[in-house]
């Protein structure tokens, strides 16, 4: 008997999605996976008025939460930051009584506009990517979630189509068995 993969909520946040070839290439094959719910935050909330209860229910209904977004000013796009601050509320995801996400898994899937070598001590961006992404890892820990090492596509807009296709294939393979691959 084959086990069903865990339900995955893919929270996609890109304010200029139509211009992101890399993110389109990553998302296209993922949408065929039945156990993956792709939730485009900018499409759902163009006015930034987030339905907190709906979002919290989505989180309750899934075991793996993927945050796919570009790296903006060493963080995430504004709507995702708003989402994190509002949806992962004290009493729901953290603090007294806030255990709704305990034991779930968090993975960040990030595209960048810079080469990998620029993310190092003394490099253009001054710090390694693991330091830049530390606030997301800390947020996962605050919510009692398991942190899965991020998938990062460096210099995304300059990647060759075959390289992006390879990243998309690796992404789909991981999503088919997210708790046994890429930990």
From Swiss-Prot:
It is a peripheral membrane protein. InterPro entries: Flavodoxin_fold, Flavoprotein-like_sf, K_H_efflux_KefG, KefG/KefF. It holds the Pfam family Flavodoxin_2. The keyword Membrane applies. It is found in: Cell inner membrane. It comes from the Bacteria. Its EC number is 1.6.5.2. One of its GO terms (biological process) is positive regulation of potassium ion transmembrane transport. GO terms for cellular component: plasma membrane. One of its GO terms (molecular function) is FMN binding. Gene3D superfamilies: 3.40.50.360. Keywords: Cell inner membrane, Cell membrane, Membrane, NAD, Oxidoreductase. It is an enzyme of class 1 (oxidoreductase). It catalyses: a quinone + NADH + H(+) = a quinol + NAD(+); a quinone + NADPH + H(+) = a quinol + NADP(+). Regulatory subunit of a potassium efflux system that confers protection against electrophiles. Required for full activity of KefB. Belongs to the NAD(P)H dehydrogenase (quinone) family. KefG subfamily. Interacts with KefB. This is Glutathione-regulated potassium-efflux system ancillary protein KefG.
């Amino acid at each position: 008997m084959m086990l069903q993969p865990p339900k995955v909520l893919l929270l996609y946040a890109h304010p200029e999605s139509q211009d992101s070839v890399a993110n389109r290439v990553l998302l296209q094959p993922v949408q065929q996976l039945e156990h993956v719910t792709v939730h485009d935050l900018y499409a759902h909330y163009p006015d930034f008025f987030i339905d907190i209860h709906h979002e919290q229910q989505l989180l309750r209904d899934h075991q793996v939460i993927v945050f796919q977004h570009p790296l903006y000013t060493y963080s995430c796009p504004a709507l995702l930051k708003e989402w994190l601050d509002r949806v992962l509320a004290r009493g729901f995801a953290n603090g007294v009584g806030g255990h709704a996400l305990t034991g779930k898994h968090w993975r960040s899937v990030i595209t960048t506009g810079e080469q990998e070598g620029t993310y190092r001590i003394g490099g253009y961006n001054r710090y390694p990517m693991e330091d830049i992404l530390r606030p997301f890892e800390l947020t996962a820990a605050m919510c009692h979630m398991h942190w899965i090492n991020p998938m990062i596509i460096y210099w995304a807009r300059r990647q060759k189509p075959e390289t992006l296709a390879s990243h998309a294939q690796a992404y789909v393979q991981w999503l088919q068995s997210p708790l046994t691959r890429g930990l």
